[in-house]
Amino acid sequence: MKSIALIHTVKSVAAGFDDSLRNYLGYEVKIHNLWDDFLADNPNETGEFTADNRNRLFLDIKAQELTGADLIVTTCSTLTPAVEMIRPFIKVPVIAIDDAMAKKGITYGDRVLVMATAGSTVGPTVSKLQREGEMAGRQLSIDTCVCAEAFKALKAMDMELHDRILKEKAGTLPVYDCIVLAQASMAHLEEEIGAVTGCPVLTSPRLCVEEIKNKLEEIRQ
């Protein structure tokens, strides 16, 4: 039986990603979860992902590697730049939650909005989209929108307030070729924000589980 090791930073994502992944795969797998909220809270408070944070993430990833997992997945976009640095030192594939989303995000057009609740997520997501655009020979125009009050509601597990803040903000946005919801904790609003804005909306979990399934199929062959 294949096994997957997940690294989370947000409680609501940790609570739901496991079941979503099992349902999508359609076959039995072992899943090992590690939740480290410090790696989201500290960068959001300090405005940077420090060397100490990178070392902490490295230890988290190594700990999950020691479970014997076939695949490691990080479910927080704030971690992605550090994940890319750490990958060469890990024996198994490491997937970042926004890998697939960034690749798809550049296919709709050059005007992209990155919407987030945690400021620490914006820089990594914008950088990843820009790199994907450069590799495709495209120059993107990327705007950002951070709803900090929604992040406070998320930390308090007040999802009703979290959702209301984001939907109200979405109603004020201009038209974009694509809106990227930068955090997995926003994914359940994909259809509603799409309806409010009239724009294509991308979320990372759905695209990530597709990538996980494809990678597991490669490993099983």
How should each PLM-predicted stretch be described?
Residues 1-221:
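Non-catalytic structural scaffold of enzyme domains
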